Amino acid sequence: MSLEGNTLGKGAKSFPLYIAVNQYSKRMEDELNMKPGDKIKVITDDGEYNDGWYYGRNLRTKEEGLYPAVFTKRIAIEKPENLHKSPTQESGNSGVKYGNLNDSASNIGKVSSHQQENRYTSLKSTMSDIDKALEELRSGSVEQEVSKSPTRVPEVSTPQLQDEQTLIQEKTRNEENTTHDSLFSSTADLNLSSESLKNISKSNISTKSLEPSSESVRQLDLKMAKSWSPEEVTDYFSLVGFDQSTCNKFKEHQVSGKILLELELEHLKELEINSFGIRFQIFKEIRNIKSAIDSSSNKLDADYSTFAFENQAAQLMPAATVNRDEIQQQISSKCNKLSSESSDRKSSSVTTELQRPSSVVVNPNFKLHDPAEQILDMTEVPNLFADKDIFESPGRAPKPPSYPSPVQPPQSPSFNNRYTNNNARFPPQTTYPPKNKNPTVYSNGLIPNSSTSSDNSTGKFKFPAMNGHDSNSRKTTLTSATIPSINTVNTDESLPAISNISSNATSHHPNRNSVVYNNHKRTESGSSFVDLFNRISMLSPVKSSFDEEETKQPSKASRAVFDSARRKSSYGHSRDASLSEMKKHRRNSSILSFFSSKSQSNPTSPTKQTFTIDPAKMTSHSRSQSNSYSHARSQSYSHSRKHSLVTSPLKTSLSPINSKSNIALAHSETPTSSNNKEAVSQPSEGKHKHKHKHKSKHKHKNSSSKDGSSEEKSKKKLFSSTKESFVGSKEFKRSPSELTQKSTKSILPRSNAKKQQTSAFTEGIRSITAKESMQTADCSGWMSKKGTGAMGTWKQRFFTLHGTRLSYFTNTNDEKERGLIDITAHRVLPASDDDRLISLYAASLGKGKYCFKLVPPQPGSKKGLTFTEPRVHYFAVENKSEMKAWLSAIIKATIDIDTSVPVISSYATPTIPLSKAQTLLEEARLQTQLRDAEEEEGRDQFGWDDTQNKRNSNYPIEQDQFETSDYLESSAFEYPGGRL
């Protein structure tokens, strides 16, 4: 063809072969038919048009024509001779040169027979060298090391480590997929001896560039693609077979390797690459580079985890350390019943470190000095941990390493939050401080002693005895949740009674036999952090003393309290929390504000014991403890709801400050409090929380109406005293919990929002009777309406339609609309096949045989702004005429014509003004009348007989009349149908 001759005459380019991957049938004469597998020889590419259409020859059908390039795939490379490196090019060096490590699948195909021979020879040589290296690994060069340890590898120097690892990775990749890369280079003798590793470190595992000057080999490692320069990016795409003009776009737009990895398919259009096919191929290459980087990083991690090298010890994450000397001293001082063998083993573990696999480092000074010591013999594991006392506190196994949190203070390794889930709990690890230091305060609040077996738990491990009145020897933080003697009478005498009550209450819990509760010890005040946590979790919703109508959700607050307490608590020491420190650390003081606000508004304890604060006795020394000790909520005796002594704070009455009588009263009222389920708060039932609050509140008001006035007076007195004490202090500051209470007062929970609270009811509902609404309605009548849900309840309602306002009444006697539906931009449709089940259900209930639905507009549409809930509404009527009437009325109401926008028609015929058109119409009518008159005259002149459909013979015509031209022009052979 002429196009082919012109192209070949220029001799500008020679194109590679392509293979068809999809079938293409030509739609025009100059196109080319293709089937999958056809070889296409490119004659002209889309260099002039950049439209993705090539001109080529189908070698199967010998036809030529245009075809889309995306239907084909390249099977040959433009310059394949530059990609191969001859085996003799570096004869003096035994290194390995590879081609492109992750070439695209488009470069895999058929090449010439000579190239295939070289490829198969290279592949065979590579595989034989790999097999030879594997044999040497098993037998020859590493024979001595493997005899000691099966995973022992020869020690290599630090510069050789990276090259050796890269070589192992390349071998693994070639074994997994030998046909993935179309570029193979021959390999030399592969040996893992020390000399060969030195040669390998000198060799460059890289990709050769396809630049015309192939003497300078660029380092194009796919793993280092992020550090490529724009020139290296250009060289890479030139290497994989893209034309030079496309590759130069990356250099022109300064696309580095980091930018290249962030490019998407739509970004390539900004590089002035107009062909979609080329952009798609480049995007596939970018994905191949990303996958190569990901696979190399994954394989590198897998390979490095197999070998434990000395120079990698500093790169690993620091593991949890255990001071075995201190543990050994504690075990030897506290435990005298250990056997001689276990004591010998423990004494030897202090001097000679216990060997573990390199993945778990017990001591930061742990090093692998001897190959025999690097791997722990698995036969010794049962012997090492045969003694049960090893894993008892404080000799249990170390905590796994964890990343430090930037916002959380350093916690002790004594307890991991991972072990507190449900029943899978472990005994907490404890560390005993010296005698002259403060007692241990546990960050997560689990103290290892049992409340049920306090007599039996004094054998091996004991906590030091402490005096509750000595503030110097007994300094407790907030998380210990103790109740000191602040203006109380005989508090120490009341503590055993509290312990008895708590032990009786906790004995009914199904999980009280777990390890945590067996090793659980209470503080001297009779409570523990476990009880505090259970108490917080069972707290009723906080209600203000002054605005009882407002509600607050306690579950989130209690969780925040526990989290803040867990952050604030220290391990080896404790200190008093002063108000000045609270100013600096507002988050740490949130738990104080939480309990102080509870104590002010609800000053009663679950056991009817009340602690009051005398403002006159609140000195600066004791004020630091007043916020945490002004309440009596730290005594929780059960996590179970059935046997809980926890009652709602507003349901209990105040009692005088007498600890003995109060505790006895609480002990006697335990069954009654457990039976009074209306007074027990149920925070887990979030859906009906609001409803249950009001029910319990009304029941309590009815039952305790006599004590109402005295309770309110005592509350006001208590609050006024505490308020005066805090206002008098200059250090008083409003806590975040109080701000939260005020902010949440005006916010209703979303779950409590009902239909009556929507804008349709608050703004759109009219107070009008059904009969009055019928008079002005476009359509009205009885219909059945389906409720919400898949199988909602069908209810009979009386509907009235006013424009796009569809309202309904429960009956015709209603004086107010019960519901409203805004049908703006809705579509009314009959029930389709998908709604057949709904229609059958409505018909089976006798609600109506004919069903239709109202479909709201699509979300986000301009006309879809309705003030009612946009959902599908189903209606049913009894007969067909009613359904037609409703459909007609609703369709008319939903037709939306915007009269503010002029109507623009696509009819492009030129028009004339209306006045001119009317003048022409009058002229046309006059011409029509004149024509009709002439026709009547012609009929009379010829004497046409209509009955016989022929000219009347009574009117003869002379021959000479036809010879005159005037007569011919005037007569013009008139017929009844008009002129001819």
From Swiss-Prot:
Keywords: Cell cycle, Cell division, Exocytosis, Phosphoprotein, SH3 domain. The modification Phosphoserine is found at S104, S106, S128, S209, S393, S412, S525, S528, S589, S590, S593, S644, S655, S735. Residues 687-703 have a biased composition (Basic residues). Disulfide bonds: none annotated. InterPro entries: Boi1/2_SH3, Boi1/Boi2-like, PH-like_dom_sf, PH_domain, SAM, SAM/pointed_sf, SH3-like_dom_sf, SH3_domain. GO terms for molecular function: phospholipid binding. Pfam families: PH (PF00169), SAM_2 (PF07647), SH3_1 (PF00018). Coiled coil: none annotated. The keyword Hydrolase does not apply. Gene3D superfamilies: Pleckstrin-homology domain (PH domain)/Phosphotyrosine-binding domain (PTB) (2.30.29.30), SH3 Domains (2.30.30.40), Transcription Factor, Ets-1 (1.10.150.50). Residues 228-292 form the SAM domain. Residues 397-412 have a biased composition (Pro residues). Residues 589-608, 621-638 have a biased composition (Low complexity). CDD domains: PH_Boi, SH3_BOI. Residues 139-163, 333-356, 390-438, 544-762, 930-980 are annotated as: Disordered. The modification Phosphothreonine is found at T151, T158, T919. GO terms for biological process: actin filament organization; budding cell apical bud growth; endosome organization; receptor recycling; retrograde transport, endosome to Golgi; septum digestion after cytokinesis; vesicle fusion to plasma membrane. It comes from the Eukaryota. Residues 13-77 form the SH3 domain. Residues 573-582 have a biased composition (Basic and acidic residues). The PH domain binds to phospholipids which is important for localization to the bud. Functions redundantly with BOI2 to promote the fusion of secretory vesicles with the plasma membrane at sites of polarized growth. This is BEM1-interacting protein 1. It comes from Saccharomyces cerevisiae (strain ATCC 204508 / S288c) (Baker's yeast). The lineage of its organism: Eukaryota, Fungi, Dikarya, Ascomycota, Saccharomycotina. The gene is BOI1.
